[in-house]
């Protein structure tokens, strides 16, 4: 990282400048996570029920985007939600679900094994054409994650 910073500085640029160049070349990806803790005696069961609900009835859309793929690492199974086609996942077994939308957004759910807590990981992306649009695109991606949280009703206690 230090070598990269020094190299960019020698060209009169910053690491931020380089990051923007990479976003323009490969796409602007933004990630975030939330953690939900359920209280009381039934907290762990509520989380298990939430996962089972997502597993048995995956969302058709999330924040207006069609959900194309469900990856179920517990069952080690991938499923195309449009065609019903399935395939085996060759990854370690874990109680994780991942939804992938038509525009490449990814939402992953992973419950804790030891406490009544579940984490949701969000990855969203967009095209970035130039540095001038960075701030507006960044805000749009943040709003997109907030829209996903609202649509999946994850902002409720």
Predicted region positions:
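Phosphate-binding and adjacent anionic-ligand microenvironments
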Residues: 2-110, 128-134, 138-157
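General beta-strand recognition
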Residues: 108, 117-119
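A generic beta-sheet turn/junction motif
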Residues: 113-115
């Amino acid at each position: 990282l230090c070598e990269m910073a020094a190299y960019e500085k020698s060209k009169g640029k910053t690491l931020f400048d380089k990051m923007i160049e990479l976003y323009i070349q490969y796409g602007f990806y933004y990630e975030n996570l939330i953690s939900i803790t359920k209280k009381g005696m039934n907290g762990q069961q509520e989380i298990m029920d939430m996962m089972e609900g997502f597993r048995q009835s995956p969302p058709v859309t999330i924040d207006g985007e069609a959900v194309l793929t469900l990856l179920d690492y517990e069952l080690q199974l991938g499923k195309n939600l449009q065609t019903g086609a399935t395939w085996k996942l060759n990854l370690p077994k874990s109680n994780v679900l991942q939804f992938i939308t038509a525009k490449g957004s990814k939402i992953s759910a992973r419950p804790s094994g030891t406490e009544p807590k579940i984490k949701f990981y969000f990855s969203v992306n967009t095209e970035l054409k130039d540095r001038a649009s960075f701030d507006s695109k960044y805000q749009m991606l943040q709003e997109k994650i907030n829209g996903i949280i609202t649509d999946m009703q994850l902002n409720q206690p």
